[in-house]
Amino acid sequence: MAIAKEDILAAVEGMTVLELNELVKAFEEKFGVSAAAVAVAGPAGGGAAAAAEEKTEFTVVLAEAGANKVSVIKAVRELTGLGLKEAKDLVDGAPKPVKEGVDKAAAEEAKKKLEEAGAKVEVK
C-alpha cells in the first residue's frame, strides 16, 4: 500500500521542530543529499545587471534641424538657456546632444518641443 502525499504532509505538519530536524538528517543519510541552501550564481559581469535596470538618465540628441531651422534654434534656446550664436552653432552642428543627464519626463518634454519646432530628435 502506497502512502499518499496528503498523509505525509499531515504527518510532517504534526511534528515538532526537533522531530523535523531529525527527519531532515535521516533524509540526508538515507539518500546521500544535503539540505544546505544552493548558492545561486550572480549575473556574469556588471553590464547585464545594468541593462536589466530601468534607465534613469537620458540624453536628448538633436539628430537633424529639419526645414524650419529658426524655430528649432528658438526651441533650443528655450530648453538650454544658450545665447543665439551658441544655439545656432548647436543646431548647425547636428547631430549633437541638447540636454544630458535628465530624467525621463524632462527628456520627453524636450523631445516634444523640438519635434514641434520641426527637428528630428533621439532620446538615448
Swiss-Prot record:
Q: Name one GO molecular function term.
A: structural constituent of ribosome
Coiled-coil residue windows: none
GO biological process assignments: translation
Q: Which domain of life is it from?
A: Bacteria
Q: Per UniProt, which keywords does this protein have?
A: Ribonucleoprotein, Ribosomal protein
UniProt xrefs under CDD domains = Ribosomal_L7_L12
Pfam families assigned: Ribosomal_L12 (PF00542), Ribosomal_L12_N (PF16320)
Is Ion transport one of the keywords UniProt gives this record? Answer: no
**Ribonucleoprotein is among the record's keywords:** yes
**What are the record's GO terms for cellular component?**
cytosolic large ribosomal subunit
PANTHER family, sorted:
39S RIBOSOMAL PROTEIN L12, LARGE RIBOSOMAL SUBUNIT PROTEIN BL12M
Protein's job:
Forms part of the ribosomal stalk which helps the ribosome interact with GTP-bound translation factors. Is thus essential for accurate translation.
Q: Which family does it belong to?
A: Belongs to the bacterial ribosomal protein bL12 family.
Subunit and interaction comment: Homodimer. Part of the ribosomal stalk of the 50S ribosomal subunit. Forms a multimeric L10(L12)X complex, where L10 forms an elongated spine to which 2 to 4 L12 dimers bind in a sequential fashion. Binds GTP-bound translation factors.
Protein name as annotated: Large ribosomal subunit protein bL12
Q: What is the lineage of its organism?
A: Bacteria, Pseudomonadati, Pseudomonadota, Betaproteobacteria, Burkholderiales
Which gene carries the instructions for this protein?
rplL
